[in-house]
Structures are given as C-alpha cells and as structure tokens.
A protein has these predicted regions:
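Short proline/glycine- and basic residue-enriched helix-capping loop/turn segments at helix->loop/beta transitions
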Residues: 81
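A positional/architectural concept
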Residues: 14-58, 62-68
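Glycine-rich hexapeptide-repeat left-handed beta-helix
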Residues: 1-13, 47, 53-55, 61-64, ...
Length: 182
C-alpha cells in the first residue's frame, strides 16, 4: 500500500478511481482529481505548500512533485503526464501537457495547455511556456509549435494509456495476458 501521510493537520485527498503504487509516497496538503495514477517510487510532497492535481494525471516512476515554502504551490491541470524521473517543483502546469522523462520544471514556471517539455530538459525558474509549444534542452527553449499529430499521438495517447495501465494493476487475481486478450 502507498504511503499516504498526514502532515501538520493536512491529509492528502485522493480522487476516485486512482491507482497508487505500493511504493508511492503522498504527503500533506495534496488534492488529486479522478483517474490519476502515481507509480513506483514517485513522491508527491505537499509539506511546505499545497499541491493540486486535476483529473487523469499520471506521475510516473521515480518522479518528484514538490512546492516552495511561502512562495509557490504546485498546480497541475487535467490530462497531464509527468515522465519517469521528472522533477516538477513549485510551478503551474495547465491541461494536456507531457513533461518528458528526466525533465525538470522549476519554481514559478508556467506551462500552458497543449504543450510538451522534452525528456531531459531543464525549464529554468520563471519560464513561461505558451500554449501549443514544444520545449527542450538545457536550459529549455522553444523548439517548435505542437502539431495535431503530436498532441493526439503523444500527449493524449500517453495520458489515456496510463488510465488503461492503472486498470491492470487494480484488477486483483487476473493475469495481465487475460486483461490484454493476448
């Protein structure tokens, strides 16, 4: 069972139909929407400020979500994928966003809807990623505008797939090959 810890009188609020891996950690002032998933060794730490997450947010293995004391909460919209080993800290991420594996999004950043932060990128403090942009690099910069194919083929596909993956883990006593119809 995941570690869900009350801190300073604040208990995480977990949305309906959410999957929490056994080694996931959720602490303090955290509010999650429905159909979210928090995977193995991911940490969501609402200890020094609050964290809100919309519906269909997946926080993949080893990701770290945190906020900044007395300055920046972490606000995440709907249909957001946060890749393996990513760090998302004290920023705002709107709807339909993919934050790639190992990416870092720092304090006071704004990532608008329908955007992608490429794997391994570092979005430095105070950066504003506008809607429909793809950013990458260290420090991250705009690479291009997002296409419909990229939005549907990556951002939406990954978010939807993680809802499906989490259903596999919620089904007790069934073999994955039976669930997948293999």
């Amino acid at each position: 069972m995941a570690l869900i810890k009350e801190l300073l009188g604040k208990t995480p609020q977990i949305g309906a139909d959410t999957f929490l891996a056994e080694t996931a950690t959720i602490i303090g002032d955290v509010k999650m929407g429905s159909e979210c998933s928090v995977w193995y060794n991911a940490v969501i730490r609402g200890d020094v400020n609050f964290i809100t997450m919309g519906d269909k947010v997946n926080v993949q293995d080893n990701a770290m979500l945190h906020c900044t004391f007395e300055k920046f909460p972490l606000i995440i919209g709907n249909n957001v994928s946060i890749g393996h080993n990513a760090i998302v800290h004290g920023c705002t991420v709107h709807d339909n966003v993919l934050i790639g594996m190992g990416a870092i999004v720092m304090d006071d950043c704004m990532v608008e809807s329908n955007s992608i932060i490429g794997a391994g990128s570092v979005v430095v403090q105070g950066t504003h990623v506008k809607s429909g942009e793809v950013w990458g690099g260290i420090p991250a910069r705009k690479i291009k505008d997002i296409s419909t194919e990229l939005l549907d083929g990556e951002v939406n596909r990954i978010a939807n797939n993680y809802v499906k993956y989490s259903s596999w883990y919620k089904v007790a006593g069934e073999k994955p090959e039976e669930i997948l119809d293999l």
